Every structure is written in structure tokens, then in C-alpha cells.
Amino acid sequence: MNAHKERLESNLLELLQEALSSLNDSELNSLSVTKVECSKGKHHAFVFVLSQDHKILSKLKKAEGLIRQFVLQASGWFKCPKLSFILDNSLEKQLRLDAIFNEIAKGKDDD
């Protein structure tokens, strides 16, 4: 991955977190952005948010215009990528893996 793309994703992550915290919706402004992945042409960004509620995606879709406007004003960029919000389930996967490893460890202890 090139340094420019990494820097863009890092800046976008910070700006999106600020944008969400500035919204008047308590569900949205308490969300955490865990990761941002930009497309090759940097015209599209996949934004991973930490939430268990699938309804939050429709709220984020409705607020996308405000969020993009905030990013443009705060960054001074000429253009903001189109945003696609995705629920980040990596924590859930990690917890499942931990449970599996604990079961394996218990099985070895019993032997």
C-alpha cells in the first residue's frame, strides 16, 4: 500500500470520527470508526463502524451528505469520496476465536 493512500485513510478516519461526534443524533455521535479503506481511485471509501445494530446503517446513509460536507469543510479537500458504511464485526470474530482457544486449552488440561 502506498504512503499517500495510508495517509488519506488515516486523515479520513479522524475526520469521520469528528463528523459523527458533531451530529445531533446520540446513536450516531457515539459510534466509533474502526477502519477506513479507500478504493484504488480514492473516489470511494468503505467506513467500518463498531455497532451491533443493523438499523444504524440506514441512519448513516441518511446522514452521509452532512458527513461528507463536514469532511470537505474540515479538510479543505476539493472532493470527498463516496462513503459506504459497514458494520465492523472483527471484535465478535476475535471473541469467538478466544472462546475456541479456551476450549482447546481446557481439553489439553483435562488430558
UniProtKB/Swiss-Prot annotation:
Keywords: Cytoplasm, Ribosome biogenesis
GO cellular component, one term: cytoplasm
Name listed for the protein in its UniProt record: Ribosome-binding factor A
Cellular location(s): Cytoplasm
Similarity field: Belongs to the RbfA family.
GO biological processes: maturation of SSU-rRNA
Subunit structure: Monomer. Binds 30S ribosomal subunits, but not 50S ribosomal subunits or 70S ribosomes.
Major localisation: cytoplasm
Functional description taken from the UniProt entry: One of several proteins that assist in the late maturation steps of the functional core of the 30S ribosomal subunit. Associates with free 30S ribosomal subunits (but not with 30S subunits that are part of 70S ribosomes or polysomes). Required for efficient processing of 16S rRNA. May interact with the 5'-terminal helix region of 16S rRNA.
Record InterPro entries: KH_dom-like_a/b, RbfA, RbfA_dom_sf, Ribosome-bd_factorA_CS
Pfam families on file: RBFA (PF02033)
Source domain of life: Bacteria
Gene: rbfA
